[in-house]
């Protein structure tokens, strides 16, 4: 459903009215990686529907608005903002601009922001951060989003592999994985 709808909206030139910034990013994408990123998110959603699993509209919206977010965040960084401030302001800006084209319910906005914010936190492998991430109510959606980002060459596969392993191992192994690496003294 999601994939077919996306293609139909593009085919009949309607997508640009619903997601103008994303449409512009798709047109300007020189890497050729954004369209497959969006398509994979749609296909994943279709798979979840077929398997009678829950679907989060916020996940799809987060995917569609990701490139506009990263462009604005990069611009904000170049203006001298801290990474956190650049990201937060970009989130607010992208959501505000998208709201001019389509209304996004507040409950979705919160979920979208959480999915985006967790992306930065996935890089922290030490201490309690991985445990807190695993317990976060948006972990699964953010983790699935992270996997999509590997295909856009934004994230190294080793990070996803580490997080996958961390979820699957016992508590003792998790503790070992989150301990600082000891340097050999000679």
Where are these regions (language model features)?
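Arginine-glycine-rich low-complexity intrinsically disordered regions
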Residues: 177-186
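Conserved, hydrophobic alpha-helical core segments of structured domains
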Residues: 1-177
């Amino acid at each position: 459903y999601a994939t077919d709808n996306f293609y139909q909206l593009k085919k009949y030139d309607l997508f640009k009215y619903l997601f103008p910034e994303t449409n512009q990013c798709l047109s300007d994408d020189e890497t050729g990686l954004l369209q497959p990123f969006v398509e994979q998110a749609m296909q994943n959603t279709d798979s979840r529907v077929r398997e009678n699993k829950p679907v989060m509209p916020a996940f799809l919206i987060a995917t569609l608005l990701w490139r506009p977010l990263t462009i604005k965040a990069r611009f904000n960084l170049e203006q001298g903002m801290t990474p956190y401030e650049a990201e937060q302001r970009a989130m607010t800006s992208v959501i505000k601009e998208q709201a001019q084209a389509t209304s996004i319910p507040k409950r979705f906005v919160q979920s979208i922001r959480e999915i985006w914010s967790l992306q930065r936190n996935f890089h922290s492998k030490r201490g309690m951060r991985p445990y807190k991430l695993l317990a976060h109510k948006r972990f699964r959606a953010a983790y699935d989003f992270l996997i999509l980002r590997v295909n856009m060459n934004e994230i190294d596969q080793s990070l996803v592999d580490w997080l996958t392993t961390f979820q699957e191992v016992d508590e003792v192994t998790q503790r070992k994985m989150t301990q600082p690496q000891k340097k050999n003294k000679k």
